Amino acid sequence: IREEFGRLDVFVSNAASGVLRPVMELEESHWDWTMNINAKAMLFGAQEAAKLMDKGGKIVGVSSLGSIRYLENYTTVGVSKAAIESITRYLAVELAQKGIAVNTVSGGALDTDALKHFPNREELLDDARKNTPAGRMVEIEDMVKTAMFLISDDSDMIRGQTIIVDGGRSIVM
């Protein structure tokens, strides 16, 4: 990146994976797999990105409602997303003096390829359709617009925050 472009302005940590099982069926390898892909990628990816942000920049993590709410079989993913949100706050403070803003965007139920792996996918989507105060499900474009705002100059004074994009669903759960 430095050779080709000279610097990096934006880093979005969107790596995600996980093992969907009840707590008592989890193995250490499930935990390690999920934490390494989700939380570890955010921390070490952000470290490397920050080294290339000589003139400041923006770092955005991606989380989900499972970080703050119980979702069936979502333990490893939910905990890893909570770790991303915590890492966001630490990075925001420690990178502020370099002019780097760090935030996370957290989404409600999105009909993505990842959701196809959930055994209760249809139930989750039906719940989102029926119970989201905004009257519709969150779309990928809603998440993209929020991330685009977070990397814009308009968000310069937003630091260390997790912006929940769920149409209000999490406040009525």
What is each PLM-predicted segment?
Residues V12, A96, A101, I158-G160:
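Short, small/polar-rich loop/turn modules that mediate ligand/substrate recognition or access, typified
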Residues P22-V23, H30-D32, L124-A128:
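Substrate-binding pocket helix/loop in short-chain dehydrogenase/reductase
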Residues A46, S80, T88:
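Active-site helix of classical SDR
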Residues K51, V93-Q97, D156:
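Alpha-helical segment proximal to the catalytic Tyr-Lys
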Residues S64:
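Residue(s) in the substrate-gating loop at a strand-loop-helix junction
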Residues R69, M148, R159-M173:
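Short C-terminal tail/terminal secondary-structure segment
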Residues T132-M143, D154:
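A conserved structural motif in NAD(P)-dependent oxidoreductases
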